[in-house]
Amino acid sequence: AVTCTVVTKALGPCMTYLKGTGATPPPANCCAGVRSLKAAAQTVADRRMACNCMKSAAQKTKSLNYKVAARLASQCGVRMSYSVSPNVNCNSVQ
């Protein structure tokens, strides 16, 4: 099951990137975390949990660049059914 600890650990290497301009590709260890998170979130419940964890972490992170955050998965070549934004409705995630 996906927990907020799993999400935080997976996305930890992305934090510096997510506070920047997104002018350079995300670091390899950040994309590895994104891929592991996608692999871990196999069920709708897992994906909703991951979404809620990312949303609350994003709200607590000062100077997070939401434009960069929204593109993170695609920059890493990963298809996600939702993006990180302050008003994403995690209950609608399939």
UniProtKB/Swiss-Prot annotation:
Coiled coil: none annotated. It comes from Amaranthus caudatus. PROSITE patterns: PLANT_LTP. InterPro entries: Bifun_inhib/LTP/seed_sf (IPR036312), Bifunc_inhib/LTP/seed_store (IPR016140), Plant_nsLTP (IPR000528). Keywords: Disulfide bond, Lipid-binding, Transport. Belongs to the plant LTP family. One of its GO terms (molecular function) is lipid binding. Pfam families: Tryp_alpha_amyl. The keyword Transport applies. The keyword Disulfide bond applies. GO terms for biological process: lipid transport. This is Non-specific lipid-transfer protein. Disulfide bonds join C4-C53, C14-C30, C31-C76, C51-C90. Plant non-specific lipid-transfer proteins transfer phospholipids as well as galactolipids across membranes. May play a role in wax or cutin deposition in the cell walls of expanding epidermal cells and certain secretory tissues.
